[in-house]
Amino acid sequence: MIVVSMTSWTKRITYVKKVVESIMNNTVQPDRVYLNLSETEFQGIQLPQDLVDYFNSDERLIINWVSGPTTKAMKKIFPILKYLQDDDIIIDADDDILFPKDLIESRLNDFERNGKRYSISSNTHTSVGFNGQMKVVSAMSLFQKKMFNHWQEFVTQAIVDTNNDDRTYLHLIWLNGFLNRGCTKWNIFILLEQYDMKLDNPISKKNSDFKGGLIYDRIAQKEFNRISNKNVIDSFGFWK
């Protein structure tokens, strides 16, 4: 089974329908898409009706309400593990990015090419956000459920307080005896044409209070200059 798992919060929930539509329009469709939402965060807040209607129209789309003291963090993947088998594939997705039509197919090809022995970690890609701006994100990595075994023993409150979710996933993969490989990059200009969007000013996905925020901003600016001035058609990544 191929599962896409994602989360969102109140300031981005209006984007989610478009994100999921871009996922479901892929050349390879997932068997399930889980949207994990915190009961605490959304208490007293009505979800957008178009999002509710869209999820109700397809049994593969599931809103998974999550409760507990740590629901504001680490809820992109962990809440769905109890529904999966060891060899099931999990692809995580950000909630404010439009994805290429062949993204899931590309991740699966990377997984096959590496002998199904590695997680496929996203390169930091140049992607298209909803305001037409370029964003530097690390979106849609591929895992298997067994790569997260013993997560409840590892993800203590101290881990939640001191680590972000992506770093925690990587550490769990290592602890379970797996390694990761970088994914194939996609062509930013094909993505722009697919969604009829223009390249505008680059911004960083990271908040300014994140310790890596400034370097992400510099990377976004550098990549924007590289693409717009030199018309280079490949997208940027930290590793291959």
Residue ranges and their predicted role:
Residues 3-11, 26:
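A conserved hydrophobic helix/loop-capping motif in glycosyltransferases and polysaccharide synthases
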Residues 1, 14-19, 152-240:
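C-terminal catalytic/acceptor-binding lobe
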Residues 101-125:
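Conserved donor-nucleotide/metal-binding helix-loop-beta segment in metal-dependent transferases, i.e.
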Residues 20-31, 39-40, 54:
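Short, acidic, metal-binding catalytic loop of nucleotide-sugar glycosyltransferases
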